[in-house]
UniProtKB/Swiss-Prot annotation:
NCBIfam families for this protein: ftsL_broad, PRK10772.1
GO biological process terms held by the UniProt record: FtsZ-dependent cytokinesis
Keywords recorded for this protein, A-Z: Cell cycle, Cell division, Cell inner membrane, Cell membrane, Membrane, Transmembrane, Transmembrane helix
Name of the protein described by the UniProt record: Cell division protein FtsL
Record's keyword annotation contains Transmembrane: yes
Subunit structure, as described in the record: Part of a complex composed of FtsB, FtsL and FtsQ.
The keyword Cell inner membrane appears for this protein: yes
Family recorded in the similarity comment: Belongs to the FtsL family.
Source species of the chain: Yersinia pestis
Alphabetized HAMAP family for the sequence: FtsL
Spans through the membrane: 23-43
PANTHER family xrefs: CELL DIVISION PROTEIN FTSL
Pfam families (alphabetical): FtsL (PF04999)
Topological type in the membrane: Single-pass type II membrane protein
Amino acid sequence: MIGNERHGLVGVIGADLIRNAKIPLILLVAVLISAVLVVTTAHRTRLLTAEREQLVLERDALDIEWRNLILEENALGDHSRVESIAIEKLKMQHVDPSQENIVIK
């Protein structure tokens, strides 16, 4: 007698799904896997975007530092240019410390 047997509801539903609904079950698993992959891809994209922003800020800071170094190099180059003009055109020369005269009022 079939009527006297007791089956668990979960077992009956599971057996019915496996027996009659294989394609929808496979599609459900595929959708779940796809959803997990979408979430992980979005997370990685956010992390990479944040890292890229940090690198852009670092690049900008390095660019500003490079420009300041170029300005400093040009300023130091101008000093040597002034010194060479003073020596060549004005016939100026460096004075030894022993030849210096200090005037005090």
